[in-house]
């Protein structure tokens, strides 16, 4: 079913909005994927906050024109699914993880920070831990010296006699 001019413009406007908010774009060829597998991929993408769209390539080219994703315009050929993500690594993770289990999904490339990513670039981006994991690792590094100091002080107190002893009551309180 072909779209009329106003419907095409609506699609372009929607994808332009996605591209404006997104940090990452991943493109993958989906030739031969069953409807059930595509539904599973879309569900996984939705759970991770990734917008997956099957678009006509000419509409996709027009939508990314003038954005940071314009660098991939030359690669927009064939049956492609486009994954836009506001998280820097989410789109790459979803597509790369699904491609590991389904050989019919072939990663074609992507873009991040205005630079073209080839297949290996997308896979490397997918291997980067998520923002939450990185923050947890930084917190762990910051907490490590304090926890080590507490352990050393606890061991030192145990060695010297079991920690702070009870202080005797003042003489005035005993006399009263």
From Swiss-Prot:
UniProt entry keywords in alphabetical sequence: Ribonucleoprotein, Ribosomal protein, RNA-binding, rRNA-binding
GO CC entries: large ribosomal subunit
Lineage: Bacteria, Pseudomonadati, Pseudomonadota, Betaproteobacteria, Burkholderiales
Protein name, entry field: Large ribosomal subunit protein uL10
Keyword rRNA-binding carried by entry: yes
Family: Belongs to the universal ribosomal protein uL10 family.
NCBIfam families in the record: PRK00099.1-1 (NF000955)
Disulfide bonds: none
Pfam families to which the protein is assigned, alphabetical: Ribosomal_L10
Subunit structure: Part of the ribosomal stalk of the 50S ribosomal subunit. The N-terminus interacts with L11 and the large rRNA to form the base of the stalk. The C-terminus forms an elongated spine to which L12 dimers bind in a sequential fashion forming a multimeric L10(L12)X complex.
UniProt keyword annotation of Coiled coil present: no
GO MF annotation, one: large ribosomal subunit rRNA binding
PROSITE patterns associated with the record: RIBOSOMAL_L10
Its job: Forms part of the ribosomal stalk, playing a central role in the interaction of the ribosome with GTP-bound translation factors.
BP GO annotations: translation
């Amino acid at each position: 079913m072909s779209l009329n001019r106003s419907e095409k413009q609506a699609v372009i406007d929607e994808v332009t909005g996605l591209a404006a908010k997104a940090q990452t774009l991943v493109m993958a060829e989906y030739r031969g994927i069953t409807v059930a597998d595509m539904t599973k991929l879309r569900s996984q993408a939705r759970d991770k906050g990734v917008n997956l769209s099957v678009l006509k390539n000419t509409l996709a080219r027009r939508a990314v024109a003038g954005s940071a994703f314009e660098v991939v315009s030359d690669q927009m050929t064939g049956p492609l699914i486009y994954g836009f993500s506001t998280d820097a690594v989410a789109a790459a993770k979803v597509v790369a993880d699904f491609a590991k289990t389904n050989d019919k999904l072939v990663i074609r490339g992507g873009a991040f920070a205005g630079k073209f990513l080839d297949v290996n670039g997308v896979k490397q981006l997918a291997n980067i831990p998520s923002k939450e994991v990185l923050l947890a690792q930084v917190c762990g590094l910051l907490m490590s010296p304090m926890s080590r100091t507490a352990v050393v002080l606890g061991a030192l107190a145990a060695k010297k006699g079991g920690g702070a002893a009870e202080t005797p009551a003042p003489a005035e309180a005993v006399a009263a």
